[in-house]
Amino acid sequence: MDQSNRYARLDLKEADLIAGGRHVLCAYVMKPKAGYGYLETAAHFAAESSTGTNVEVSTTDDFTRGVDALVYEIDPEKEIMKIAYPVELFDRNIIDGRAMLCSFLTLTIGNNQGMGDVEYAKMHEFYVPPCYLRLFDGPSMNIADMWRVLGRPVVDGGMVVGTIIKPKLGLRPKPFADACYEFWLGGDFIKNDEPQGNQTFAPLKETIRLVADAMKRAQDETGEAKLFSANITADDHYEMVARGEYILETFGENADHVAFLVDGYVTGPAAITTARRQFPRQFLHYHRAGHGAVTSPQSMRGYTAFVLSKMSRLQGASGIHTGTMGYGKMEGDASDKIMAYMLTDEAAQGPFYHQDWLGMKATTPIISGGMNALRLPGFFDNLGHSNVIQTSGGGAFGHLDGGTAGAKSLRQSCDAWKAGVDLVTYAKSHRELARAFESFPNDADKLYPGWRVALGVN
């Protein structure tokens, strides 16, 4: 059934929809299956996403028609489809009237993903009007709060030097805590890897006790504050809260040095909101493990990593992993920097829409995946600043002289970039950085030809 007479209004102007302030706008790349028209399929998509189905129903009234989602722009050659969703469509909490991201996803990326006339459809961006944006929690903490704990300026405090304890599974509690202590002697921040939790060989309570002690010892040794991101991911709300409360109690006076990591993609918006609301004084670390199943450029359905990141700020993530923008081992390229800008800036331009965040706190980009001291300068050149949390697993513990030296090499690399000094030149007077060249010779040969002669390495 062709529903374009009801669910398509190509006379509507995007600027007018934004000025009106009552529509969420979504931009998709959509291709109909063979034999279906573009506008016809787009209208069916909008109907299925809002007030319609595949037939007209007798219960529809004038009010219902007033909240139809409407296709307002199409470009069949580029496969671009834009839909305007009235804000009234989205579910709100009965306890406080707040917005819920699961409702946004249910409508904009729900049943429409399985429609028989759609070859593929992927959301590439969305715009949130002020009246709807104000209903989301947004972050309560971000990198500025970490800088404060670390004793740095709360504006432009610079890179937080971090790691992921490797191997990601298989370490008993004491070796895990020992690795934390080793890194903290040179670095700032350690995160649980996403599967680390309460395995039988590493009970959470025993591990956390030893990590809290390692933090105290490292702080005493260095005279510097240290940070730990503890995984509280669970299926059950009460389990997440129990883990969080135990961790804070165990760290005691260092409770404000603790972030909570949640695997936000695999557990969904409910887990992120649980952590955000139950622990508003902790940095909420959104890990996105599994997201590539829908966000990868190879996937033609779902939504992009840009969309995932933008949603995370609405939900209240203090920080989210944003990949390495083509400078590490993960999928991505240099243009991904717009993802970071959308997370951190008061207003930012995305692929399709300009978003004003109306004072909502920024979400911090967390950089991880194959990074080391040699790759950081190129990454910072592309991004334009170093105000990120950077977590290197192999880039720290793959250093020939161990985790402490690896941490120091990462910091030295950032210092060199901020000073505008060539990395090879800086390495001549900084041993840990110089040894990073020997630790990662393939990267060194590719990125810094002639380094062996300059550093006197055979």
Swiss-Prot record:
Q: What Enzyme Commission number(s) does the record list for this chain?
A: 4.1.1.39
Which cofactor does the UniProt annotation name? Answer: Mg(2+)
The record's active-site residues are 166, 287
In terms of Pfam families, this protein maps to: RuBisCO_large, RuBisCO_large_N
Keywords on this record? Calvin cycle, Carbon dioxide fixation, Lyase, Magnesium, Metal-binding, Monooxygenase, Oxidoreductase, Photosynthesis
**Catalysed transformations (reactions):** 2 (2R)-3-phosphoglycerate + 2 H(+) = D-ribulose 1,5-bisphosphate + CO2 + H2O; D-ribulose 1,5-bisphosphate + O2 = 2-phosphoglycolate + (2R)-3-phosphoglycerate + 2 H(+)
Q: Which residues form a coiled coil?
A: none
Q: How is the cofactor bound?
A: Binds 1 Mg(2+) ion per subunit.
SUPFAM superfamilies (UniProt xref) = RuBisCo, C-terminal domain (SSF51649), RuBisCO, large subunit, small (N-terminal) domain (SSF54966)
GO BP annotations, alphabetical order:
reductive pentose-phosphate cycle
Task: Please indicate which residues carry the site annotation Transition state stabilizer.
Answer: 329
What Gene Ontology terms describe what this protein does at the molecular function level?
magnesium ion binding; monooxygenase activity; ribulose-bisphosphate carboxylase activity
Q: Does the keyword Lyase apply?
A: yes
Q: Does the keyword Disulfide bond apply?
A: no
Sites bearing N6-carboxylysine, chain numbering: 191
Q: Which domain of life is it from?
A: Bacteria
**Protein family membership:** Belongs to the RuBisCO large chain family. Type II subfamily.
Further comment:
The basic functional RuBisCO is composed of a large chain homodimer in a 'head-to-tail' conformation. In contrast to form I RuBisCO, the form II RuBisCO are composed solely of large subunits.
Quaternary structure, from the entry: Homodimer.
What the protein does comes down to: RuBisCO catalyzes two reactions: the carboxylation of D-ribulose 1,5-bisphosphate, the primary event in carbon dioxide fixation, as well as the oxidative fragmentation of the pentose substrate. Both reactions occur simultaneously and in competition at the same active site.
Q: What is this protein called?
A: Ribulose bisphosphate carboxylase
